[in-house]
Amino acid sequence: MERLGLIAGNGQFPLVVARTAKGRGYSVAACAIRGETDPSLEKEVDALTWVEFWELEKLLDFFKSQGIHQALMAGQVRKERLFKESRVQLPSRVADQALLAIVVKSLKEIGVRLLDSTYFLSSDLAQKGCFSKRAPTPEERKDIAFGRDVAKRAASFEIGQTVVVKQGVVLAIEALEGTDQAIRRGGSFGREGVVVVKMARPRQDMRFDVPVIGPRTIEVLREVRASVLAVQAGKTLLIEKNRLLASADEAGLSLVGI
């Protein structure tokens, strides 16, 4: 039986990966991050240990003890913890990608290859075009094009993946707070009918921090009465896709792959 190491952050992504991998005959050993990972993951995997997000050596020791040679990252760690946790010492101006590169290098040194985060879920990547019942209006399409350009630039500067726009005005750009709070912030300015655009980095490494949307994203969009969510086709993962689409259609949201 093949073994998979799972580095599990927050949200449903790690649970979906674990279930899918188990369904394909893998034995899954998960490294769960305190304060982030859903505790119910323990029921979905064969072995699990809890670590603080800065305890890289503990993660490596666990994978070595489990005989892991391939691993996958799923779910995020809230970025504000990098600054709030007193035990974490970061070099100035360090980027997400630099931190993750350290993890990749450390895994490689113990013989563990890091797979793409979408390895088991490639069929759930967003396709190009409208995949909701309601298509965007001409005005919404203008905002999608505008938001796409802004989001691509923001992602290239490691600022964030998501922007909120309305009538050609930028209402919010995702920063440290994450996607949900950025949507809420933009929605508070634009009120009903904002357009949300989520893009990958220009040279997105699919092993980590891939754009993800799920039912929780739709809940937040409904909360602020957004009208459109546009995501990068081929790079954005749709978690619990059927439930996500049903919720979007119920709310009259337009979902578009660009």
Named regions from a protein language model:
Residues 6-8, 30-31, 71-74, 96, ...:
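General beta-strand structural signal in soluble alpha/beta enzymes
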